[in-house]
Amino acid sequence: MSARPRPEVLAPAGDMDCVRAAIENGADAVYFGIQKWNARARATNFALEELPDLFALLRLRGVKGYVTFNTLVFSNELDEAQRTLEKILAAGPDAFILQDLGIARLIHEMAPGVPLHASTQTTTTAPEQMELLKELGFSRVVLARELSIAEIRKIKSQTDFDLEVFAHGALCVAYSGQCLTSEALGGRSANRGACAQACRLPYDLIVDGKVRDLGDKKYLISPLDLAAYELVPELMDLVVSLKIEGRLKTPEYVAATTRTYRKAVDNAAATFSRDEVLALQQVFSRGFSPGFLSGTNHQALVQGLSPKKRGVFLGKVSGVRGSRAAVTLEAPLKPGDGIVYDYGKPQDDEPGGRVSYVWRRNARVDLADRPDSVEFEVWECPPPQVGWKVWKTSDPAMYRELRATFEKTTGARVPVDALVEEDGDKLRVTFSDGVHRVKGETGPLQAALKRPLTTDYLRQQLGRMGSTPFELRNLEAKLGQVMVPVSLLNDLRRRLCEDLEKVRRANPGYAVRPGALDRLRAKPSRTEGEPQLAVLCRTVDHVRAALEAGVSWIECDFDDIRKYRDAVPLVRAQGAAIFLAPPRIHKPGELGILRNVLGAGPNGILVRSTAHLSFYRKEAPYLVLIGDFSLNAANELTTDLYLSKGLARLVPSYDLNWEQFQALMARIDPGRAEVVIHQHMPMFHMEHCVFAAILSNGKDATDCGRPCDRHAVTLKDWTGKEHALKADVGCRNTIFNAVPQSSSQYVRKMLDLGVRWFRVELLQESPEEARQLALNYRNLLEGKENGETLWRELRASNFMGVTRGPLGREE
């Protein structure tokens, strides 16, 4: 049995310098975005015109190139997206990394042979989700960062998919593809590459109505960075790719991280020197953790003291003498290094600067290191106070060393084998890189009178590959007693290297079938009927209130799914229909939760994951399935896909503004859309449990004592708004926007578009508030109330006011 291939080292590239840094430091593949439709819109990214040369370089160096097209695409953008994809395909990518399943359909229709990788934005956490991905032509999935190695092992045992995991870099506190915070608070969508990083901002914790004093801990949902270099041996047999986050980071970061993970993969038993770890910390670090790979530990994931890149910890100020600060070093320090003083208020403009001098025992030195006690001075910086922490934020010498690794072609080279043989009176030489072969000849050969060509001599001459990307690996010579002038041999070597470069750069190309989008677009039908109101309830009291308001479609999303069994008979007794929501995230070993929801006896299910779709289609084909917002349906290709898989109707993506919403409704059957017209937007959806992290000493659900059952908690933001925190049955937390949003002003227009299903979502309303809210929207749909009037009433009656949400946002 052949040994399993080692996982690839997959490096990020936000610009061309990062590409070079990745290549020269041993990356097997790089991933990068174009200037639109990628999840790192703030990166420099690449123009379409740059792609042919970029892919030619990557092919030459034997490095794969993956294009991230990993955002949602709206209906009114699909034609442009198709034209863009045609240009990318013409450049010869090795794979696309995708979020939008409609775009996967489009690419597969355009060029069926193109490899597709499911982005972490698809929130893939279970093998059940991979059934649909396989149908769409995906061969690899980038797993959610919230999975442990044990969970990855379970997934691996149940699928033949290639698995990719993030091994290093920044961690999102929310599940990728499920974070609506930037959209809710700033009108800029993380699903469109415009994350505003609200997780890196300070929050106060309000417990049962009172501010909890947490000291300096303000950054309650800002996780440490992932660093899994020591876990690589455990991942080697599970994944095909180790991914480094960082398309917004520097080339030096790419160089340092790539070479570290290259070493980890090449030598699974490798240990890492202090200097190697310090280099990782220096290029970018908020502090390192294994993330969720080692299992859940809510106490370790978030420290809460700072959201900033800190670099390397040097020590604490032990004394101040004039402009000098004294510290016992934990890491190297030298003149020219950049430092910052940390006094526990990272939101302030912290003092710091370049170190001008370092003294050890009153003598100036060029370098000091642990455990030296030193004094140092910083140019034009006020003196610190005793007890302040000191961080080294930059190390110019280290950055010069890292930059030197990619400023010239001196790093990873392509191995070449040579065959040298006689062909009549000619010398024939063949170069092979394992895929391509080039041949050349020179001569005429001469009988050797004194010094015939030897294998060692040929290796010496043919191995002088200089600035080419090649290195001679094996050489086989089949020669008699002959010789050839060295000038001819050198000329032949140069020509063969040039020929090999040319064939390696060549674009194999993809045959693109025209008209793909037109073939996929179905002519929409139109389902007629009276407007229907569904109310999503979060407690049994909410259910009673909605029924009292005359609502006949009840949807339930309870923290405790055991209480579904109390809600179902209440609803059925009134002749109404009830739909139950399983937890949004489904992991290996959690099928029991889905079965418990089914056992409550609902009329249907709110499908919030493709795992739900797979399970309930098989286990209960009689149920009515409603696709929820978390499926991220933003265009007709995605919507039609889900509806064709058994959904009765589908909630469109919350990322759509009014213009984009209209474009979608024009391309689908609007009678099969269910539109949420009132809600508190679910912003962060997290594996990290704030309840456990702060209100207990527990690491996870097994030892936290479930403070979520005993306390009402909100997070108070920088504007004074208090956002509700809820935990579901899987202990995953959701933070809901404090300010409700209403689309009452758009309801009349939606009816004109053909929309027939509307939803109102409750959160923490009292039974009377819930009843009145349901009644107001029921009256609106029945024409007894005006949308503008209802908007004003809601705005006046709510302490926090009300917003229009994404529909009111202009692009």
Predicted regions and their residues:
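Surface-exposed amphipathic alpha-helical tracts and adjacent flexible/coil segments at the periphery
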Residues: M1-E24, A29-R40, L54-F55, R61-T71, ...
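Conserved non-cysteine loop/helix-boundary elements of the Radical SAM core domain that shape
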Residues: A41-N45
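Glycine-rich, highly charged phosphate/nucleotide-binding loops
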Residues: F46-L51
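Active-site PLP-lysine loop of aminotransferase-like
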Residues: T125
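Short, conserved phosphate-binding/catalytic loop or strand-edge motifs used
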Residues: E128
